[in-house]
Amino acid sequence: MTKLVVGLGNPGSKYHETRHNVGFMAIDLMAKELGLTFSEEKTFKAEVASTFLNGEKVYFVKPTTFMNLSGLAVRALLAYYNIPMEDFIVIYDDLDMEVGKLRFRQKGSAGGHNGIKSIIAETGTQEFDRIKIGIGRPQKGMTVVNHVLGKFSEDDYAMILLTLDKVETALHHYLKTNDFEDTMRRYNG
């Protein structure tokens, strides 16, 4: 079996560690912990790192398409490696959740998230596993765009780092057990 774990974000140093890039941050942490390095795969429009965990090939992916076209990379990788949707998981930010809150879902709408909209449009389904990381709503007077493309405050960044550690632990559990429902029960919150 092969797994595809995708973190959403925008490429480039301008967006490094912005709220919208918590998916990239989660993937980077996982790759670092496993001693993996990313290579740019232009065919897939993504940076890809891979390893074997518990006898399964696992691809960790950061699309290089910018958020709104993330589905292009996901569709290309799923097709090339013949990975079924049940073996695909995506990690991304959610501004409707408090900063640092963690939520696992098995399916659902895009909820206004353009990266998820793109994945749904390209794969033709909402039936895929997700890990959502709360980034909170913008402060009064700030636009959503400025909020999601902005950096975390020092306090929020500290909370996000704790959440990313929890994501890493949850991903290890999921990849070991292949049981997303159990992972949801253990790590939602």
UniProtKB/Swiss-Prot annotation:
Keyword Cytoplasm assigned: yes
Gene3D superfamilies tied to this protein: Peptidyl-tRNA hydrolase (3.40.50.1470)
Binding site for tRNA: 15, 66, 68, 114
Annotated site location: Stabilizes the basic form of H active site to accept a proton: 93
Swiss-Prot/TrEMBL site (Discriminates between blocked and unblocked aminoacyl-tRNA) positions: 10
Xref: Pfam families: Pept_tRNA_hydro (PF01195)
Keyword Magnesium (UniProt): no
EC numbers: 3.1.1.29
Localization per Swiss-Prot or TrEMBL: Cytoplasm
Catalysed reactions, as listed in the record: an N-acyl-L-alpha-aminoacyl-tRNA + H2O = an N-acyl-L-amino acid + a tRNA + H(+)
NCBIfam families: pth
General function of this protein: Hydrolyzes ribosome-free peptidyl-tRNAs (with 1 or more amino acids incorporated), which drop off the ribosome during protein synthesis, or as a result of ribosome stalling.
Name used for this protein in its record: Peptidyl-tRNA hydrolase
Organism of derivation: Streptococcus thermophilus (strain ATCC BAA-250 / LMG 18311)
Organism placement in taxonomy: Bacteria, Bacillati, Bacillota, Bacilli, Lactobacillales
